[in-house]
Regions:
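Accessory cap/linker subdomain of secreted extracellular hydrolases
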Residues: 129, 136-218, 272
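Active-site glycine-rich loops that stabilize anionic/oxyanionic intermediates
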Residues: 42, 49-54, 118
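Short beta-strand/loop motif that positions the catalytic acidic residue
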Residues: 219, 225-227, 231
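N-terminal cap/lid segment of alpha/beta-hydrolase-fold proteins
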Residues: 18-43
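Conserved alpha/beta-hydrolase "acid-adjacent" motif
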Residues: 56, 232-242, 251, 269-270
Length: 319
């Protein structure tokens, strides 16, 4: 089962439904817009999924709308009209969504936030560093710097994940360990554990990290970093802490927050009693490790969601 299909099932049950909302396909960008049932102008939250691609965050959009936000899932690869792989994705994809959302009469364009998970968290931090109209960021198990794009099959050429103004963003490349891990996993030698590959790349290519860091000092609002210490995709704790250190070093004048969840895995935030997953099938005989335990992931999710909504309420809903 593809990770995107599993996320479809888990996202739909993540947050309790509080009121009827209306959801419709976006017309000026690829995604879904969900609106609260109440009238008036509302704060906005843009939602970016991870390396599963597609429009999977549409399932969370309705839940954020139930909490009083105009919520828009923004797809950025893997659907018609978009790049088919997570490679050199234009940050202007988010800019187009911002323009479309900002023109709506039911939103307060001065209260716009962005949420991203994993690669979407990486993308959200780049977007918020680029567009001053974003005033709050929730970065779930993110990277505060650009990583190499996810390879296409056996391709070995390194590309950036993102572009700004048509130019590739400086990035941290993978090391040889990453290719070895894929070869071992798909050669029948155990599950795919990406964490050692990212750890090796951070060590071997440490000199590239400063140049690949996003200009988080340009973010016009607070950032919530969420990390999981049993993350088997990448070290979201170390990466989030690099982001926090960068903000402090650059005197970011907002109430930034760092939440670290012990024992939790990469997609803990979307854990439910039915889908508190610690690994996922990625082929007929291969699984990919996500980390955590069912119990730890469920406990962390139950703590994290109220914190996310409280953070966004303080940053956006209360002006």
């Amino acid at each position: 089962m593809r990770l995107s299909l599993i996320l479809s099932a888990t996202l739909a049950a993540t947050m309790p439904v509080q009121a009827a909302t209306h959801c419709a396909a976006a017309t000026q960008f690829v995604g879904t817009i969900c609106t609260p049932s109440s009238s008036g102008q509302h704060p906005v939250i843009l939602l970016l999924g991870g390396s599963e691609g597609g429009n999977e965050m549409s399932h969370s959009a309705s839940r954020f709308a139930d909490a009083g936000f105009v919520a828009a899932s923004v797809a950025y690869f893997g659907l018609p009209g978009l790049p088919q792989t997570l490679e050199e994705i234009p940050v202007e994809t988010v800019g187009k969504a911002l323009d479309a959302i900002g023109a709506r009469t039911d939103v307060d364009k001065n209260r716009i936030g962005i949420f991203g998970i994993s690669k979407g968290g990486e993308f959200a931090l780049l977007a918020a560093s680029t567009y001053p109209q974003i005033h709050a960021v929730v970065a779930d198990v993110p990277s505060p710097f650009a990583w190499q794009s996810i390879p296409r099959g056996a391709e070995t050429n390194a590309h950036s994940s993102w572009t700004v103004g048509g130019k590739p963003v400086a990035f941290v490349p993978y090391s040889a360990t990453m290719g070895q891990l894929f070869a071992q996993a798909f050669g029948g030698h155990g599950p795919l554990d990406l964490r050692p590959g990212y750890d090796a790349a951070m060590k071997d290519n440490a000199a590239a990290i400063p140049g690949a860091m996003f200009h988080l000092e340009n973010v016009h609002g607070p950032i919530l970093f969420i990390a999981a210490d049993d993350d088997h995709i990448w070290d979201s704790v170390a990466q989030s802490e690099l982001g926090v250190q960068y903000l402090k070093a650059h005197n970011h004048p907002y109430d930034d927050v760092y939440q670290h969840f012990a024992g939790a895995g990469h997609i803990f935030l979307f854990a439910t009693p039915q889908y508190a997953l610690t690994e996922v099938p990625i082929g007929p005989t291969t699984t990919m490790l996500l980390g955590g335990t069912a119990q730890a992931n469920l406990a962390a999710a139950s703590q994290a969601w109220p914190q996310i909504l409280s953070f966004l309420s303080a940053a956006l809903k209360n002006g």
